[in-house]
Each structure stands twice: as C-alpha cells, then as structure tokens.
Amino acid sequence: MLPTLSVFFMLTFVLLCFLGILANGFIVLMLSREWLLRGRLLPSDMILFSLGTSRFFQQCVGLVNSFYYFLHLVEYSGSLARQLISLHWDFLNSATFWFCTWLSVLFCIKIANFSHPAFLWLKWRFPALVPWFLLGSILVSVIVTLLFFWGNHTIYQAFLRRKFTGNTTFKEWNRRLEIDYFMPLKVVTMSIPCSLFLVSILLLISSLRRHSLRMQHNTHSLQDPNVQAHSRALKSLISFLVLYAVSFVSMIIDATVFISSDNVWYWPWQIILYFCMSVHPFILITNNLRFRGTFRQLLLLARGFWVA
C-alpha cells in the first residue's frame, strides 16, 4: 500500500469522524432545545439524547486517541495519556452499547405486536422505567471503566518499574495482558447488552415482516403507504442490526488482533471501528420527521451560503 493511500484512509477517517460528530451534535442540540421548551423529554428522546451525547464525546476522544497513538507509537503503551484517554473511552464505549440496546428494546416494545402477558406488561411499564435503565447503564459503565482502568494502570506501573513476569519484553507482556485480561473483559461486559439488543431487534424485525406480508396480501399493492412505511422501518432496523454487529465484532477483534499505527491497515481499521457511530446518526435523522425537516433546512441554508 502506497503512502498516498494511507493518507487517503487517514483523511477518510477524519471526515467520517467529523460527520459523525456533526450528526450526533445535531441530535443532541435538537433534543436539548425541546427539553428546554417543554421541560421534559419523551422516553424515546431520553434514550436518543443519551446515545447522541455518548457518541459525540466518544468520537472526539477516539479522534484524539487515534492520532496520539499514531504520533507517539513507542511510548503510547506506557504513557499517562493512555490511561486518561482509555478512562474516558471505556466509559463512553460501554454507555454507548447500553444506550443502543435500550433504543432497540424501546423500538421493539412500541412497534412489535405480541400478545404474551409478559410482553404486554413490559409494554406498559417500560416507558416509566427508561430513566432508571439509563441511570443503571451509567453505573454499570462506571464499574466496567474501573475494571479496564485497573488493567491500564497495571501496564503503566510495569512500564515505569520495568518489571515484567518471566523473561519477556514490555511489548510481549503488554500483549499477553491484552489477550488474557482485556479481551475476556470486553467479551463479558459487551455480551450482555448485545444479547438484549439482538433478541429485541430480531423480535421486532420478525413482527414487522409478518405484518408487512399480511398487509401486502390484503392490499395486493406494494405502493400502499402503510406497506411502504413498514418496508422502510424494516430496512432501517436491518441496517441498525448490521451496524451494531459490525461494531461489536470489530471491538472484539481489536482486542485480539494488534494493529500497530505503523501498519498499513491502521487507518482502514480505524474507519471500521468508528463506522457505526458515524453512520447510524444519519439513519436516525432521516427516519425522524422532526430531525429530518430541520436537517433539510440546514442543508439548504448551507447550500445557499456555499453558492453565494
């Protein structure tokens, strides 16, 4: 791979992050304005506000981390900066996965059509429990962050003292800790929200697909507005599922496959890691009437300034 291609991927990564920051910032500003005007937010808006906020700061931290690692490869593992950056990144990453999970659960409860008593009870109680679920997610993320911080602090102390177990170098010892501690910790802490997400999103897709087929059979027309609305909802949910799965798998692979910043695949891999949190906000904006209208006006305004 030529250096120019590496520069291309680096610029693509920066553009992707900035687009994600702008999209998430737009969602947060829209909901903040609504919160100030009405004095409260709907349960769905609470989750979107929390998700947008965590993704906004996560991409800012991730952008700093990627370039700091790229510019300070040698001393990165044992630097104090790694501890500070990782402290914020681990908290925001855990919170983001949990907020995505609650968003999928809320979609499932609001849209899916099941007659099971447990589902009906959850449909009735879940909106009132959303603030507690969000608070619980933050507390869980704090605990997860402390567990990751212990590992990062161990690496930092070992780097300062130059004392490693066995006849190994710091790089080998650091890599062993990544495999034996960080990777299992990531799998355990991320599997719970991912399992909830997968169950709720698959139930919702199944319910929507069954309902869409029933409407197509009754109307005998694919041009019916209700059929088209359900088809759009299905496409949106499937894209959400794919992006979430890519994000989960890439996080796990990132803990097992070490890609150094001097590797030709470093910047393409950063693009994959941040792809979901950059693209999904635009899906949320296009599928929300309030967001879509304001966003279109902003684009037209920006286009007018650009032409002028």
From Swiss-Prot:
Keyword Transcription present in the record's keywords: the answer is no
Q: Where in the cell is it found?
A: Membrane
SUPFAM superfamilies per record: Family A G protein-coupled receptor-like
Question: Which tissues and organs express this gene's product?
Answer: Expressed in subsets of taste receptor cells of the tongue and palate epithelium and exclusively in gustducin-positive cells.
Annotated TM spans:
8-28, 61-81, 89-109, 129-149, 187-207, 240-260, 265-285
Gene Ontology, cellular component aspect:
membrane
Extracellular membrane side: 1-7, 82-88, 150-186, 261-264
Topology relative to the membrane: Multi-pass membrane protein
Q: Output one GO BP term.
A: detection of chemical stimulus involved in sensory perception of bitter taste
Q: Which UniProt keywords apply?
A: G-protein coupled receptor, Glycoprotein, Membrane, Receptor, Sensory transduction, Taste, Transducer, Transmembrane, Transmembrane helix
Q: Name one GO molecular function term.
A: G protein-coupled receptor activity
Residues in compartment: Cytoplasmic = 29-60, 110-128, 208-239, 286-308
At which residues is glycosylation annotated? Answer: 152, 167
Highest taxon of source? Eukaryota
Task: Relay the record's extra comment.
Answer: Most taste cells may be activated by a limited number of bitter compounds; individual taste cells can discriminate among bitter stimuli.
- Which family does the similarity line name? Belongs to the G-protein coupled receptor T2R family.
Q: Provide the function of this protein.
A: Receptor that may play a role in the perception of bitterness and is gustducin-linked. May play a role in sensing the chemical composition of the gastrointestinal content. The activity of this receptor may stimulate alpha gustducin, mediate PLC-beta-2 activation and lead to the gating of TRPM5.
Protein name according to UniProt: Taste receptor type 2 member 41
